[in-house]
């Protein structure tokens, strides 16, 4: 309503000259997005439903209690999804308007974007225990759900990015089928993983379910626009993050040190991509000081 009033959108509505062909194209493009969004909701909501129904009485807690802890576990991974939403809003216009060298453009932006997300994910997993203790002390046990929910949120951000390939090619039905595949597989995995591993199994199911969507969309993006996600690099990052998550959950001696070292390894491995984004943002945010900082770091790297 606010946008309608401030933008005077009624000036752009012409009821007399209705273009039926354009109307049909818009419907074909937009209608599949509704069940696709519902499928995304199913992936998140099914976790809570399965945990509530299957974990009642586990360790003396009701199903509602476990469901509440799982909801609290989303607290830190929300940082990633918020970052992804901000980026997607800024990126969407460029994705549509950039026509020359689109494959190279998408590949370059994804590499930088994924580098930032991988570093953030590693930091969240490493620090989730102390942060949950300070911020959500009454729900401290919820930290167990954070590691794989963070991995799931990373996949969700990637899926949102790759959805741009469907927008560019007006192939929204592919968005529906990929999300539907993720939703169905997530429900199936929820049932088995929760039986095997308890409520933490729901977070693993979310990671694998959204991971399936990511793989399908990466293949589509490659076929549609020639984009490459550099699968070896992405698999290595996810492998290290999964290892960090498992280490944190297993709690071996000095687990904080080992997870910290893995976080440092992720940051070093992705530093080039992170610095590429920082080089663009720092001058805009800090002005002259930002340019001086960029110059100093560039000189240090060259040495």
Tell what function each PLM region has.
Residues 249-303:
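Membrane-proximal transmembrane or re-entrant/amphipathic helices at the cytosolic face
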